[in-house]
Amino acid sequence: TLKSQTGDLKIKVSPVEGKKDTFTFTMPNVMCRLVVKTEVKGIEKDEDGYCLVGTLDDLNKVKQTIDLGNNDINIKLTNNIVGYDGNPIGEYNGTFDGNGHSITLAMNDESNDYQYYGLFEKLDNDAVVKNLTINGSIKANANYVGAVAGLCDGAIINCVNNATVTNALKDGVTGGFIGQNMLQKSPILISNCVNNGEVNGYNVGGIIGYSAGYTYNFSKITDCVNNGKVNAENNGAGIIVVGSHCMVTNCVNNTNINANKNAGGIIGVVQYGTKAEIINCANNGSVVSKETAAGIATTYGAITVKNCL
């Protein structure tokens, strides 16, 4: 039990590395905010405070730290990492700089324990993933699956996905990079990203599964290219399979889209009651569906298309 006081109170604890511990503090008649952070042991930092990750063991160490609650650490790769077969890295809110390097995934989970599944489970508002290449494969049975993240509220910039992404869940949503992005505090920026990996599932987008913004603040996807084959049991698209208040600019789909319901070269479906803008985009692949197909987009909502091929 701690006596009431004003100002900052620092308490140093020593948890066991790799384990979650519970600490109970009693402060009568006091309202306070408690922040618990853990340091990454055995990891060097550069002059800017980035944790330098060059091995699979290093990656597992920073994953442990993030999972324990220190989710705003900044990370920079110093080497290619091969064979990551663990669970998704938990909710992350820092900057992950691939620094031109790659991570090769061998992730496979059929448990249906995850709503969001990817290298990262969730990317929060201030999270940035940049300059990263993803190789290998990822297989899951989750609501939203993407090679980089199941859910993204942050930014993904200048990244490449070469991994095959497969989601076995019926009604699941899958993207080459992101399963779902939801606009929270500011426009989501997905820019300068290229997908070369095959994407398979029920609702499938080459770049993003479900992309959502607000009427006054659209989510933004810019300068992205899809070269990976899209195989969808339900809806499929080259860039976004389901869009809601989103803007897609300077994006290109170069591959074939195969779906059983709605298929679009850029957007599969614009949701009813929402809007989408597609500007300076091109579809160079064939779009095949048993029901509805369009070179640019199919829609139940309002759509603006400018300078598209």
Region locations from a protein language model:
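Surface-exposed interfaces of beta-sheet-rich extracellular modules
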Residues: 1-22
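Conserved "repeat-terminator" motif of extracellular CCP/Sushi domains
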Residues: 17-41
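Surface-exposed repetitive/solenoidal architectures
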Residues: 39-309
